């Protein structure tokens, strides 16, 4: 390819003239003389062999060539700024701020441990953890508000072609009941017994609830006929409600390990029914990721994959 007919300085000048509307104002904005601005434009017009501006006393207006030039000048200069930012971030490989997203269960029971391990290795990196529904977190990653996320459940269909979804493990959902419930004496219950229970449920927008309903439907159980006593948006609140004898609930096994160990809650196994959801890491492939984010992704992938392997091969 032959030498380019323009320089970055010339593109910046053309862009500024178009934005400010005159050579004089552009010169002031760029802290150079007006003759220097005019000379650069003339040199570029001579190089391209076509005018870039219609010149009149009121305003510098772009020609068709000028419009094309400004359009690509904005993209080129933006990429140059992004390149400079990336190079600057190389100097601070182990510092910066990460915004990590997580759905309710992963944010409450998994992320604190992962963040603790990461912060021990990279103490200079600040981490902001946002815990919301899978849908809200997914949109946060897509919009650039969240750098990386770990979620359970299905990513919104409209984002599945936009985000990179790295599935790393399955999370089993358990039916929990109070220790004093008659079903707690049984080795397992029949799926039809679910209609006899009173349920404490997550709100209808929860991905956990969707997974439960879909799995039960495939097993011939219509959850629309369940007795829903109340809906809560907190796993801890649901566990406390079940412990208090207010009903039964489906929650992630990872959220009840302590309660099962202490005998506070009972995991009621359902014969011929196993409910699982996929845990995934979400990133936006269109974004530039600085080193702190790359480091975090690498570290948690190693931890999560190792943990998943040990769980599947006890």
Curated annotation (Swiss-Prot):
Gene Ontology CC annotation, any one: chloroplast
HTH lysR-type domain ranges (all copies): 6-63
DNA-binding region listed in the record: 23-42
Keywords: Chloroplast, DNA-binding, Plastid, Transcription, Transcription regulation
Domain of life of the native organism: Eukaryota
Keyword DNA-binding: yes
Gene3D superfamilies in the record: 3.40.190.290, Winged helix-like DNA-binding domain superfamily/Winged helix DNA-binding domain (1.10.10.10)
UniProt keyword Hydrolase present: no
Role of this protein: Trans-acting transcriptional regulator of RuBisCO genes (rbcL and rbcS) expression.
Name of the protein this chain belongs to: Probable RuBisCO transcriptional regulator
Species whose genome carries this gene: Emiliania huxleyi (Coccolithophore)
